[in-house]
Amino acid sequence: MLILNEEQYAKNIYENKNTDIKTVLLKIGYLTRYFLHSLNKSDSDNYKETVNWMKKYHSNFDESCYSNLISDAVKKAYKRPFYSIDKIKITKSELEKIASLNNLRAEKVLFVLLCMAKQQSVSNGFTDGLVKYSITELCKTARISVPAEDREYILHNIVQNGLLGYPKKNNTQCLIVNFINDEDEVVIELDELDCQELAYAY
């Protein structure tokens, strides 16, 4: 899923309505940012509220094990205000480029990458169609069942068609979506609900 309204996403975590985050580090990161940016808590109150939340909702929580991590997250929260995206807009020419692959699995993967690139341009400040991805999560979001050894082949095929490229410094899992055209006619607008199941929006 893609997050469009990060403050609402963090609030759902705070209210224990969002259980899809499994890692403690991510939970603490969202909580400390929520306490700072949404509830205007001081650093000391931010720490206390985060500890109280973890004690309430995280089984076997031991403050001594997480004290440094929480303190660090409280400091880092200042550098990460929440972002908000109204809708992800897909244009006619973008859809035509995707459809030109004539392969449904590849089309779904590319559609997801396009949406991710548009979201990450706001969430991460990426430019020029840069998108960070995990091949496992990409296939999961696209709802395609592909043997592990064939997953990179799908991406390679899309690259060969000129629709994806690699950044000059490719030391991370990043690609460049080469066909973004925000100036064309908008034919699809994806809201928060749509972005929970992108594969079904294509």
Where are the predicted features?
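Modules that initiate DNA replication and primer synthesis
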Residues: 1-106, 114-129, 133-179, 187-189
